[in-house]
């Protein structure tokens, strides 16, 4: 009987300790995927800034990425970082919109804003005791 109690107690502690990791980890994986892909597309778009069709495709992907992030489930352990994820993705979306409309200067400014907001996002995630994984 005592052994069963110890096993149940150990299981409870394990669940308690790692439940945040499971929820935070899933969110962080999704956030990292969204941020990394947005950053990659932004860098590729900067090289191909004159290609309107490429910019249109990147803009469409950026809109979808922002929409997906807007409806993600956010664990309370990481909730303070989520608005910054949205700002990162919004700046990438606006940058790709500028590229699609041939506004090179606006594109570069918004790309820089997205990069700066990503830095802030990563700092906040670290302050909360987490880290965006490398995906």
Residue positions per predicted region:
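Bacterial N-terminal signal peptides that target proteins for export
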Residues: 1-10
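Short amphipathic alpha-helical heptad-repeat segments
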Residues: 33-36, 58-62, 81-88
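Sec-dependent N-terminal signal peptides of Gram-positive bacterial secreted proteins and lipoproteins
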Residues: 12-16
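Short, solvent-exposed, charged loop/turn and helix-capping segments
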Residues: 63-86, 129-135
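Heptad-repeat alpha-helical coiled-coil/4-helix-bundle sensor or tether segments in soluble regions
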Residues: 85-97
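C-terminal amphipathic alpha-helix
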Residues: 24-58, 94-135
């Amino acid at each position: 009987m005592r052994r069963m109690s110890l096993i149940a107690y150990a299981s409870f502690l394990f669940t308690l300790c790692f439940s945040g990791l499971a929820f935070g980890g899933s969110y962080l994986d999704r956030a990292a995927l969204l941020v990394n892909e947005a950053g990659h597309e932004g860098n590729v778009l900067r090289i191909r800034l004159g290609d309107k069709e490429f910019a249109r495709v990147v803009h469409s992907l950026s809109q979808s990425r922002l929409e997906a992030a807007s409806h993600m489930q956010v664990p309370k352990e990481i909730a303070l970082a989520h608005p910054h994820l949205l700002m990162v993705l919004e700046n990438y979306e606006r940058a790709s919109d500028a590229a699609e409309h041939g506004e090179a200067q606006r594109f570069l400014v918004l790309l820089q804003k997205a990069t700066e907001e990503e830095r802030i996002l990563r700092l906040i995630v670290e302050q909360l005791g987490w880290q965006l994984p490398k995906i």
